[in-house]
Amino acid sequence: MSQKSKNPRNSYDDKFNIIFVGDENVGKTSIINRYINNTFLDEKKETIGIDNYSKMVTIKQKKILLKVWDTVGQEKIALMTKSHYKIAHEIILVCAIDNKDSFNSLNDWIENIKDNLPNETIPIFLMANKCDIEDTREVPREKLKELSQAYNIDFVECSAKENINIDETFTRMLNDIYQSNYIKNGLGLEEGSSSSGVNRVCC
């Protein structure tokens, strides 16, 4: 991806795209709204299609336009195609710790991504939502760790409702995207600035 040149129509240096996928009612829209608007939206939407949200962020003194794509109404894995994934700089899988079926389907989601993007290496990150309701947990942390290790992806337990590990996770993802794209373009970065390899649980 090439760096954007500033011009009268652009007030940012670059644009990053993150797409959220996963089963219905796991909190994808709630996570996005918590980060973009700092509000909790109980996920009751029935919109068909893909919604997108925008937020201007600053990374290493560069203005970045973040576009977050919410696959509302596209929760059936078969509906997701290359055209959905190819815009992404990072793909976020979401499950809910109180819904074991949403966890069990993650393997199918990951395989669907690989099938649609066989020659690309778009990073995948797992957010296990609703960690504030520990008493109804159906997905053991050990299972999350096993899946993370099996596919070499990072994961975090989070809560959109209680705002746990939301901002920190987006900051980590944005920094990783920035590093990946600017290294690829030979623009140089500080050594040792990567934040990858972080798995977080509720605390």
Predicted regions mapped to residue ranges:
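Generic enzyme active-site microenvironment
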Residues: V68, V94, M127
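Inter-motif core of Ras-like GTPase G domains
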Residues: A78-K100, L106, N112-N116
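Switch II (G3) loop of P-loop NTPases
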Residues: I64-A78
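Conserved Walker B
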Residues: V72, I97-D98, C131
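Conserved catalytic-core motifs of eukaryotic protein kinase domains, centered on the activation segment
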Residues: D42-E46, F103, R137-E138
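Switch I (effector-binding) loop of TRAFAC-class P-loop GTPase G-domains
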Residues: I36-K63
